[in-house]
């Protein structure tokens, strides 16, 4: 559609350029912008245009346009608003969805912009009304309807307005009463309290009293007596009588009309199909309660205005005041519209393939052309933000039939594609220790063991009182949280579980389980040492990809293969994975285009292969749904512009961000549905409410109220954990907040979750724990290649057998400040004086240590201390002393870090005395004294150094520190 700027109203210039809400009021047929201070105020005699601009994850802006018609607005103003909305859409590029909003029948999406409610005021521009603050407060009665958003309507202040089904708010001069009809739900009552808070803040400066009255309690308390006194005393309420607002319209019958020359002509057809819509025309789809206007991409601005008028007339003539009109442009159809059609092929974004570039580059390289410039890969996409601490404790079990086997620490990250696993990960959260219990299903695993794994994980969660989060993960669909937990993750072909062995025996298929002496090919992927994977693939040339590094081995040879589009990071990860897959064999490097014959022989010869990097489902903008699950039927309702307050403790909610599904379960949900939370998540994927072709293997998380981890709360603009620490149902909690001036009051401290599952002890055995990498300060700059001295010190703080990585783990960003409650000081953990003192003493002397479980060291902001009584003065002195020691320890660590970073990469130029290898190695029975134990190799003679390391000292010190450490460990000099 080509549009001249002369056809567009100048009031819309520059509109929709940034996220937010913009509103115009129709004044003398001209859209006039209203100031930000007036956003949310509507007058019954006016018509408005509301533009909501949303910034999407893709960086694009989405526009939704609503035109709101007050109950007393004139037909001319309403018509102007409808036409100007079409012009605004044209000014924005013709992509916006347009909604007709009638006072009292607004869409939930529209009301979500103005939470908790809108209360239109009498008057308007046409009547010359000027808003003046009344000197005397007028007693008003409002009816509230809605479970997720609230429709508020002022009704006559009379007993006849009340009924048992709705909730009413009586706003008097000194007190606000909420009357809860006996047939209203807890959720509706809780939402109505948000309106009470709004009225209290807006019309009473937040100072008046609030009271609730329960329908049927007669004169049980003073508040009830006072409430009924305004109505002349108590009397039974009449039954609700049906009126025009309560009429329902058949939405099962849908009719399609084509608009030509201002007339809506029926389109014949038994079923609706996408092919019925012509891009050169406009159509009306009448669904009773909803009327859609579909406008082809090539239609003119006048055609669109005419179609909109025809739809308005259709609604008006059939007397359907509640019907909503939605106008959509071809290519930007909404989910409700597309769902009316039998088949609708949704356009997908095409990705540019790297195949052509890779093949041409490889051909040129074989012809002797320098392809260095051609081989530069496209800028890497930003790595997803990590929202989980990776310094926690991990336990992993392999499922064998109906039983599970605990894995040794060395095997925690080595999975088989034919097996299922259960894992438990305990880690420091923002306010308490958090636990994630999950299952991982290999692609070749059997259904029986998958069911066993889910049952085992669910029982673990249930035994811990539903505090941990639960995850269901499939091979190939792992989220970033899982990879960060596992760190060096390897997936082998085949399996060793009883279920897998039984399956291949019954099916009489070959067992391709990984054999370290056989031919195996691994694809290396990841973003760094804390997130790297080696995936075993078929040992054939077609499995190669120019964007990756590979490891290929048989019983006697090891090759690394570098694709032309791979990076230096990929090379580093391949070197690290070699340490795990083939630690004792020297590898031979192969570059794409210059491979040896032996390399191709192991792969069975050359073949065509891809060069396009494998991509995972991207995370999309989150959508929140409220769920009801009865008789195996799942019903969902989308909550727009959601906040934490939309989560009701009696209900189950789902956040859908396409790549992952989060099922949130309130504390007051019935026990039966708590146990079915994972099933509800699976049913949601099957339902595919957004028609986005959700993968049935998408990760599902089950999150219990009160145990929300950071990777869940990140979807909310703010999060207050004290709200879930309150007792009672949603209504009782909201009432406490309203009566407390809008501040949540925690009834009890959060329970600290146990560190592990099973047995009598809550702490796992050290032998079964994998030592984790750790970061000494969450605010430290990322340091590459820590030196042996620093690594040795870090190892002391973790455990004696700690595994050293070259980089600290990713820092988990604190999303929200800790919630402050009147009793928060009571919940703060006690200072670990003895631990700090003992660790500080390590700098002078390291005494023999008893076996202990490695615990993460995590810096946390200091909290103000409340003054203690005089009797505790001795304890205060001890605490001050310990704080000094802690500060000293931190400063020494930072100082050492700076010194070691400065030494990074410095060659050995000192004139040190030479000592024999037998006296320098760590296991020596006659060790040399007075040497730097972090540089034992420097005291070797040049000849013995070359014999042990296979290189000169000069070449050795040019290697990165992590590689130096690897060589030193191999010869017992580290």
From Swiss-Prot:
Modified residues (Phosphoserine): 777, 787, 890
Ranges for domain HP: 909-974
UniProt feature, compositional bias: Low complexity: 824-833
Region of interest (Disordered), residue spans: 738-783, 801-833, 845-930
Biased composition, class Basic and acidic residues, residue ranges: 872-887, 912-921
Gelsolin-like repeats: 29-79, 150-190, 262-305, 394-451, 532-572, 634-675
Positions with biased composition (Polar residues): 888-898
Tissues where the protein occurs: Preferentially expressed in vegetative tissues. Detected in the whole seedling, hypocotyl, cotyledon, primary root, roots hair cells and trichomes. Expressed in flowers but not in the silique.
Localization terms from the record: Cytoplasm, Cytoskeleton
One Pfam family recorded for the sequence: VHP
Residue stretches spanning the membrane: none
Gene Ontology molecular function: any one: mRNA binding
GO BP terms, alphabetized: actin crosslink formation; actin filament capping; actin filament depolymerization; actin filament organization; actin filament severing; cytoplasmic streaming; root hair elongation
Function comment: Binds actin and actin filament bundles in a Ca(2+)-insensitive manner, but caps the barbed end of actin filaments and is able to sever them in a calcium-dependent manner. Involved in root hair growth through regulating actin organization in a Ca(2+)-dependent manner.
Protein name: Villin-4
Gene giving rise to this polypeptide: VLN4
């Amino acid at each position: 559609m080509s549009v001249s700027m002369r056809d567009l109203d100048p009031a819309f210039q520059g509109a929709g350029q940034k996220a937010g809400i913009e509103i115009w009021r129709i004044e003398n047929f001209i859209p006039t912008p209203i100031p930000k201070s007036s956003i949310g105020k509507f007058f019954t005699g006016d018509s408005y245009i509301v533009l909501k601009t949303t910034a999407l994850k893709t960086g694009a802006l989405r526009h939704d346009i609503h035109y709101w018609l007050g109950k007393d607005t004139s037909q001319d103003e309403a018509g102007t608003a409808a036409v100007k909305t079409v012009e605004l859409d044209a000014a924005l590029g013709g992509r916006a969805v347009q909604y007709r909003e009638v006072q009292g029948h607004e869409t939930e999406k529209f009301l979500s912009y103005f939470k908790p409610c809108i209360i239109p005021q009498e008057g308007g521009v046409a009547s010359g009304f000027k808003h003046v603050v009344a000197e005397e407060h007028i007693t008003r009665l409002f009816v509230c309807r809605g479970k997720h958003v609230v429709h508020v309507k002022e009704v006559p202040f009379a007993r006849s307005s009340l009924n048992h089904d709705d909730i009413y708010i009586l706003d008097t001069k000194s007190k606000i009463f909420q009357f809860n009809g006996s047939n209203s739900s807890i959720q509706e009552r809780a939402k109505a309290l948000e309106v009470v808070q709004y009225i209290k803040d807006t019309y009473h400066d937040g100072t008046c009293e609030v009271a609730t009255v329960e329908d049927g309690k007669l004169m049980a308390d003073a508040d009830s007596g006072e409430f009924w006194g305004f109505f002349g005393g108590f009397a039974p309420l009449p039954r609700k009588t049906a009126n025009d607002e309560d009429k329902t319209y058949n939405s099962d019958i849908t009719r399609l009309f084509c608009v030509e020359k201002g007339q809506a002509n029926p389109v014949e057809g038994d079923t609706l199909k996408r092919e019925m819509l012509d891009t050169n025309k406009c159509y009306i789809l009448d669904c009773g309660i909803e009327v859609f206007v579909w406008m082809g991409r090539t239609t003119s601005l006048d055609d669109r205005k005419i179609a909109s008028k025809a739809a308005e007339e259709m609604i008006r003539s059939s007397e359907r005041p509640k019907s909503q009109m939605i106008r959509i442009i071809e290519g930007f159809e909404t989910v409700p519209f597309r769902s009316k059609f039998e088949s609708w092929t949704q356009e997908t974004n095409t990705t540019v393939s790297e195949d052509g570039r890779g093949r041409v580059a490889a051909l040129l390289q074989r012809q002797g052309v320098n392809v260095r410039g051609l081989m530069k890969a496209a800028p890497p996409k930003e790595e997803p933000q990590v929202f989980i601490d990776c310094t926690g404790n991990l336990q992993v079990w392999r499922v064998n039939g109906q039983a599970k086997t605990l894995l040794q620490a060395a095997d925690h990250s080595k999975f088989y594609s034919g097996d299922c696993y259960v894992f438990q990960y305990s880690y420091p959260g923002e306010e308490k220790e958090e636990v994630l219990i999950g299952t991982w299903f290999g692609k070749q695993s059997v259904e029986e063991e998958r069911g066993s794994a889910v049952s085992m994980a669910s029982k673990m969660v249930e035994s811990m009182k539903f505090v941990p989060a639960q995850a269901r993960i499939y091979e190939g669909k792992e989220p970033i949280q899982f990879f960060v937990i596992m760190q060096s993750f390897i997936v082998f072909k085949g399996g060793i579980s009883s279920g897998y062995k039984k399956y291949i025996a019954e099916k009489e298929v070959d067992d391709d389980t990984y054999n370290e002496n056989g031919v195996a090919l691994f694809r290396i992927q990841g973003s760094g040492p804390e997130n790297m994977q080696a995936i075993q693939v078929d040992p054939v040339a077609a499995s190669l990809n120019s964007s990756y590094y590979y490891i290929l081995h048989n019983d006697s040879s090891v090759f690394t293969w570098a694709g032309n589009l791979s990076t230096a990071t990929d090379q580093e990860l391949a070197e690290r994975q070699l340490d795990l897959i083939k630690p004792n064999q020297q590898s031979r490097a192969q570059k794409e285009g210059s491979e040896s014959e032996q390399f191709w022989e192991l792969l069975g010869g050359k073949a065509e292969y891809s060069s396009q990097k494998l991509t995972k489902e991207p995370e999309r903008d989150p959508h929140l749904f409220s769920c009801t699950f009865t008789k195996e039927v799942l019903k969902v309702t989308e909550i727009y512009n959601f906040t934490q307050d939309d989560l009701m403790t009696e209900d189950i909610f789902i956040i859908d961000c396409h790549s992952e599904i989060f099922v949130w379960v309130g504390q007051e949900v019935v026990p039966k549905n708590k146990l079915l939370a994972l099933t509800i998540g699976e049913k949601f994927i099957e339902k595919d409410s957004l028609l986005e072709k959700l993968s049935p293997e998408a990760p599902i998380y089950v999150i219990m109220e009160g145990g929300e981890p950071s990777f869940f709360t990140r979807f909310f603009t703010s999060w207050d954990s004290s709200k879930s620490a309150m007792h009672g149902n949603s209504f009782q909690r909201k009432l406490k907040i309203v009566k407390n001036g809008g501040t949540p009051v925690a009834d009890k401290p959060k329970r600290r979750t146990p560190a592990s599952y099973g047995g009598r002890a809550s702490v796992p055995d050290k032998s079964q724990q994998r030592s984790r990498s750790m970061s000494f300060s969450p605010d430290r700059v990322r340091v590459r290649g820590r030196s042996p001295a620093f690594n040795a010190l870090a190892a002391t703080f973790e455990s004696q057998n700690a595994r050293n990585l070259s980089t600290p783990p990713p820092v988990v960003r604190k999303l929200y400040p800790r919630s402050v409650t009147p009793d928060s000081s009571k919940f703060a953990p006690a200072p670990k004086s003895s631990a700090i003192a003992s660790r500080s003493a390590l700098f002078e002397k390291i005494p023999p240590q008893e076996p202990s479980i490695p615990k993460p060291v995590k810096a946390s902001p200091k909290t103000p201390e409340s003054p203690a009584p005089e009797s505790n003065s001795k304890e205060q002195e001890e605490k001050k002393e310990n704080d000094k020691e802690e500060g000293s320890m931190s400063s020494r660590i930072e100082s050492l870090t700076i010194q070691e970073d400065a030494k990074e990469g410095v060659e050995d130029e000192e004139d040190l005395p030479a000592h024999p290898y037998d006296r320098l190695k760590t296991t020596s029975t006659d060790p040399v004294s007075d040497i730097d134990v972090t540089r034992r190799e420097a005291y070797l003679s040049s000849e013995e150094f070359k014999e042990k390391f296979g290189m000169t000292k000069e070449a050795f010190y040019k290697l990165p520190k992590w590689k130096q450490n690897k060589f030193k460990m191999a010869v017992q000099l580290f």
